[in-house]
Amino acid sequence: MLIFPLLNDLSRKIIHIDMDAFFAAVEIKDNPKLRGKPVIIGSDPRQTGGRGVVSTCSYEARAFGVHSAMSSKEAYERCPQAVFISGNYEKYKAVGLQIRAIFKRYTDLIEPMSIDEAYLDVTENKLGIKSAVKIARLIQKDIWQELHLTASAGISYNKFLAKMASDYQKPHGLTVILPEQAEDFLKQMDISKFHGVGKKTVERLHQMGVFTGADLLEVPEVTLIDRFGRLGYDLYRKARGIHNSPVKSNRIRKSIGKEKTYGKILRAEEDIKKELTLLSEKVALNLHQQEKAGKIVILKIRYEDFSTLTKRKSIAQKTQDASQISQIALQLYEELSEKERGVRLLGITMTGF
């Protein structure tokens, strides 16, 4: 039974489409000899001195614990038999535009989240189809027949639940969460599977004895806000499936960044520079996925005494290149760093799109 019927617009029909291992799938489509093999999109660490991050990987590679944003070195250690392929982002962008064109056959209310995923509001759609399930199946069919790629689909009455649904059965899955099913669906879900709940937050929730959606549902809102601030308010709403943000076809992202808090204070300059390089590669990956390039690099450093400093640098030409971002970040570090102070957090952000 729903405990939050008045806090959601239950009439919306939202589809979340997420391409399955998109970059790897495009490469396998173009080279069928790769089918069935562990394929990793990213620099081969044997050729880069261990540098690089995984953009994505095939499900065969995921079986070895490889995942997006993992360092290429660790990916190789987990799966030495993998085929490493440097990303061809222009090719992926072209395929992404073909997928976007398929979406537009059904609705113009499309909110792309990256090159390989988007929300679609099909409450009112171009073909007058009443069933969101039918539309999702037609989209999956179109993508397969025209591009020989698979996509997973999630359907619900808001974006949060649609995203949770698309993640539930992959690859090539289709999951529907009806209003009367939402509470039970979220209750049984591991808290680490909640969209928008990061690793550090999961660890803190575990310390509170929260491991599932059912556990989270029992925590009072005031307790969550006291422990997590604004995030606590969001967690309280997620436990109840509340998400009122509409699908925004003109969504504009103003910045893309990555930051990491270190459990062990970083003191060695070599370690700090290594982490900055890795963060730069992750930011570059996100830029490619979001089809963005920026002209401003922002470095953030939080020291062991919790004091935080930021410094930015503008460049003449927009970039999404990992090596260029890394070079600028390292330069900013040299200008900003107080070498005798330990570092507990590093962050790199690109803006100026």
Swiss-Prot record:
Residues reported in the UniProt entry to bind Mg(2+): D18, D116
Site (Substrate discrimination): F23
Active site positions: E117
Domain annotation UmuC: ranges: 14-198
GO molecular function, one term: magnesium ion binding
PANTHER family named among the record's database cross-references: DNA POLYMERASE KAPPA, DNA REPAIR POLYMERASE UMUC / TRANSFERASE FAMILY MEMBER
Protein name, UniProt field: DNA polymerase IV
Native species: Streptococcus pneumoniae serotype 2 (strain D39 / NCTC 7466)
Origin organism lineage: Bacteria, Bacillati, Bacillota, Bacilli, Lactobacillales
Gene designation per UniProt: dinB
